[in-house]
């Protein structure tokens, strides 16, 4: 064996052993039997490239892809186990239906294996029952930021062009909706202006509610490298409500009270405007920005009826705050521009127009910042009782100075600490506020950067538009021009698409509870574990009139409360694509056949589409008392369709689709179960052997989808190109990706919009504004702010539920490094399970001593809504201050979302999982 072969074999063996896969001695000398191919990691929004080895129909090893620009050959601990997530002992391999002894569906029955045909028969029956009784609003789809792009696009098309419902919403509503609103309100277009290259180019990394060391560990390795490259110059600051691993290399750690990030941002802005006006980039502001604001009295996204029959008495005092709050000294000071004082009742009069905004003058903007002095902000925000007020003030000053320093490049990163927030959209806007004031946005090494949580929350949920109000490429159902564009691309009649936005994710749950939705289909997520105030939704799922379908790979909580479970193919058992946090789109090929009778979510969507004729769905449909969708059947006939054509025929197996060659050269040497079937000879939804669709369905879906963005600043490359590269950052124009958007040096569309300028914020959403002051708009005449961004003033407001005498602790939830989301996959990897076998209740030693607790004691964590048992950890990786506990949500045996509050940001409808009040006592 020569030196090169020795190194190669050693590397392969090392990668396999890291991933927990044994390497027989025979393999050590014959790795050429392994077939390697590039793919994408299944987990977070970082978008790491990986290499996958397959042998004898199984994935046998994974390793980091050295050619991948995101991770450069590294993986985190989860990434190394991409192979093992696929082969858990309880992998779902056949459809399961609740049935009685006679073989009939029975809501109270036990799960029994059934054929795909029997599963789809019952699914069709129950769907049509709800659809015919309640109309297009009577059904719902829980989608995902973990859909492949093709899966999400197929689901969106079936729902909005087929069923004419907008009740499809992804679990990305839980993670990125506030970021989306922040982008759309500020820039007029979604997704970051910067890219990961900013890490190597910046002088300062400031994390806000983003424990990157655990949640984006590969990006954190790049941050660490940058810090080590120049210890004196490069500064790292970690702002959090509790101490975590991201603080380990931080120059400054700032522990603040929950929700007071709003006040800290306004303090920084005040420092700039009042005390360092020379730091303001006045030319940038004048040429490229306007000042704006909106209403403050917008509620907290809870039900506005505290007397709803499903509420327990203990819940009502919190829910009452949806309509009115009593202002304390601190909140009254922040809202003083509205003429209020401490003790006033503050009514939420603008819940229905939370997203309305208008232009204000710089003088009004400055007036809004007036209360946020260092003294006020430090008093309001200091989160650690062990820290002196003076020390906290010094940290705030140091933080402001880092932003203000004239030639210092600054990147602000955030994730769920910002987004899962009752004012999440506001705090996103505030980050841009400070960066715009300083002219430190959309420049290499400087910018406010929202990090994505899920692997395709950007690529699928946001870009495809699988939200209840959206269409692809930032279009929305409420806009008639956007509907027209979509209907033309989809080749469906005008007025097919429902113009009324549907129910967001949490509201689908509420609608199930209220009987407004009676059929729900869950795809690629676990809503009954991931949604706050879960006791309500468990009861709703088990209501006799409701029918729940869950497509999944393992039996998680959602599957356990379902009526029908469909076994889904996992990531490398199908073709797909993801889009990451830096706008990088990456594709992969099917590597192995699915386990058992599992099939892809795309296949499930298309097979279900076969069950519906146009005359059943494109007829006249009542939406509500104000809106009835017209029949479009005559128009369909004029387009060459028959009313007896199925949605599959029209939407997915049309003439264009069938033009995509199933034997395309790009697919040579790889399986494609959806296109050709496979050796398992699966009995399909019609009871016959499924032999494939006979056309390259994934390529068709991709090429049709990309039509939405071409020429509109969302340009994507063709299907084949992505299989030759390690991803591209859109917009991709003339074969070239874009690193920094809105900057005319780098962005084709910015240059096109403003050829004689340095920047152009060319997004066109909400770019017609009226004028007003801090209180309200003052005229109805709109003016254009084309190519400009908004600098928002948003006040500090407190969370609706805060610690009290009865419930004295804040509760925050989140993730840990070793597990992904609800743990459905990672808890089945033995090595990851052994590393972190249960979710712990992290708390301070002082609180533990006060409660008479020892390390490892079992405690009850109880709120007004529910309680769970968890084991106390006072010495672990997370170190909360006195008065706060942190419990991750990956463990279904520590079902923490029974405890959390279903309050949301009223603009984004994203749940605040970081703030509710609990009591802790020994179990």
UniProtKB/Swiss-Prot annotation:
Mo-bis(molybdopterin guanine dinucleotide) binds at residues 78, 146, 171, 175, 208-215, 416, 420, 526, 551-552, 574, 601, 813-822, 897, 914. Gene3D superfamilies: 2.40.40.20, 3.30.200.210, 3.40.50.740, ADC-like domains (2.20.25.90), Dimethylsulfoxide Reductase, domain 2 (3.40.228.10). The keyword Iron applies. GO terms for biological process: Mo-molybdopterin cofactor biosynthetic process; nitrate assimilation. Its EC number is 1.9.6.1. One of its GO terms (cellular component) is nitrate reductase complex. Substrate binds at residue 889. This is Periplasmic nitrate reductase. SUPFAM superfamilies: ADC-like, Formate dehydrogenase/DMSO reductase, domains 1-3. It comes from Campylobacter jejuni subsp. jejuni serotype O:23/36 (strain 81-176). It catalyses: 2 Fe(II)-[cytochrome] + nitrate + 2 H(+) = 2 Fe(III)-[cytochrome] + nitrite + H2O. Component of the periplasmic nitrate reductase NapAB complex composed of NapA and NapB. Belongs to the prokaryotic molybdopterin-containing oxidoreductase family. NasA/NapA/NarB subfamily. Predicted to be exported by the Tat system. The position of the signal peptide cleavage has not been experimentally proven. Residues 1-30 form the signal peptide.
